[in-house]
Amino acid sequence: MKACVFPGQGAQFVGMGKDLYDNNPLAKEMFEMANEILGFRITDLMFAGTDEDLRQTKVTQPAIFLHSVILAKTLGDQFQPDMTAGHSLGEFSALVAAGALSFEDGLVLVSKRAMAMQKACEATPSTMAAVLALPDATVEEICASIKDEVVVCANYNCPGQLVISGSIPGIDQACEKLLAAGAKRALKLKVGGAFHSPLMEPARTELAAAIEATTINKPSCPVYQNVSTKAETCPETIKANLIAQLTAPVRWTQSVQNMIADGATHFIELGPGAVLQGLVKKINKEMTTEGMQ
């Protein structure tokens, strides 16, 4: 069975989507529609901006969403996955690709999500760190041991690769303890703030109202959501999981394992980069993977 997966923040690069825009009339039309909806020419930043432009959360998230979703739309009838999933932001791309969300509604929600997250990051300086080669339980235990600071596991990317999220002093303390416990690496990431942690609560509250007011349809195939890790098709459950996602961890390892248990054998990553293909292979080396961008 075929699974289509969609990347999240961090996969962006200058020039992403330009080939699509230049060579496919439908893609060009959709990119121009996006420029109108957003009220600025995001295509200028995607195709010819600077890395710094693209690193701004309010630009990064809609840019990656557009690249992924427009790519899926241009495939037409060739795009017929048996199941989909997206990593963090990529979950919105997966829902649009599966017909649960309209392109316009998806873009508006992603833009609101990005703005709300950027605002929360500016209100409380915070960060994230990648942790390599420690069991999940050890990382969880160390995060829980840090008192008076927010430190949580935010991304379960593949066995032996987690991302933690929290306040800057909390992450600094956690990195020291993790290295002492034998982590191969505990490295702070260049991100705007503590995504998928309780520090995103103001953004979650803001986005919840927008998600509640948006129509979500039954998807054409199951969407494996980050929060539940299971195949979801019920619009109300999808909404609840989308709202919870901002302050909850991305359980990617478990999601991919569940997709495989349900019959997935071939994973196609749609959008910039090849991060998810690498993670799928680390979760189960028997899987075949390919990327489209």
Predicted regions and their residues:
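FabD-like malonyl-/acyl-CoA
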Residues: 1-139, 189, 266-293
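Alpha/beta catalytic cores of group-transfer enzymes, especially the acyltransferase/condensing modules
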Residues: 9-11, 38, 98-247
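A short, flexible low-complexity segment enriched in Lys/Arg and Gly/Pro that occurs
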Residues: 62-68, 245-252
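Non-catalytic positions within long, well-ordered alpha-helices that form the structural scaffold/packing
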Residues: 76, 179, 260-261
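Short acidic/polar active-site loop segments enriched in Thr and Asp
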Residues: 82, 149, 184, 265-266
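A short, acidic, amphipathic alpha-helical segment used as a generic capping/interface helix at domain edges
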Residues: 249-264
